[in-house]
Swiss-Prot record:
Residues 193-215 are annotated as: Disordered. GO terms for cellular component: cytoplasm. Belongs to the SIKE family. This is FGFR1 oncogene partner 2 homolog. It is found in: Cytoplasm. Keywords: Coiled coil, Cytoplasm. It holds the Pfam family SIKE.
Length: 215
């Protein structure tokens, strides 16, 4: 029976070590999530500044407007890629945590079964010790999960706003180009009329509407 207890204790220690390793990975993931949150906040501030400069941007050349849209698209794609990587890491850590929890419950069950013929005080003390360590790891994983979900929601909301604003800018740019084209045509027609009136050899152009009315 002592061999069984020793084996169970060794397995429990191994599980604790694995939990510590995953705890380190979770800390790294939390740091990445914090960095992503800071970048999201920076993008929000950038969006507010861009909205304040919308009036000025309308009078800028089309190339400047297109360049700004391209830069925003690159930033959105980069954030979406990082968000996807963080989602994948979160799923991997959750799967690993579920596996460790399953192994831990199995070991504790074996330990409790073996404790029927051994000192229950030692077994309960060991159980409490490992339960505290496991609970600490679970709390950190839950904290990481909450931060990740908040970052994902913020990123999705910001991405939708950026997408709608880009669509509006593209529509506005299209209207401005149409107005510019109409202005160019009107200017050319006016220039032709002025040239015809100032030319001494130009023959008078009959008024088609007037001829039709007389007929």
């Amino acid at each position: 029976m002592s061999c069984t207890i020793e084996k169970v204790l060794a397995d429990a220690k191994e599980l604790v070590e694995r939990l510590r390793e995953h705890d380190g990975a979770a800390e790294s993931l939390i740091e990445q999530t914090t960095t992503l949150n800071k970048r999201v906040e920076a993008m929000k501030q950038y969006q507010e500044e861009v909205q304040e400069l919308n009036e000025i941007a309308r009078h800028r050349p089309r190339s400047t407007l297109v360049l700004g849209i391209q830069q925003e698209n690159r930033q959105i794609r980069q954030l979406q890629h990082e968000n996807k990587e963080l989602r994948t890491s979160l799923k991997e850590h959750q799967s690993a945590l579920e596996l460790i929890m399953s192994k831990y419950r199995e070991q504790m069950f074996r330990l409790l079964m073996a404790s029927k013929k051994d000192d229950p005080g030692v077994i309960m003390k060991l159980k409490e010790q490992h339960s505290k360590e496991l609970q600490a790891h679970i709390e950190k994983i839950n904290e990481m999960t909450a931060v990740m979900r908040r970052a994902i929601e913020m990123d999705e909301q910001r991405g939708d706003r950026e997408h709608n604003r880009i669509i509006k800018l593209e529509q506005e740019n299209k209207r401005l180009r149409e107005i510019l084209q109409i202005t160019k045509i009107s200017f050319l027609n006016l220039h032709k009329e002025d040239a015809s009136e100032n030319s001494p050899h130009s023959a008078p152009v009959p008024n088609t509407d007037l001829i039709l009315r007389k007929s």
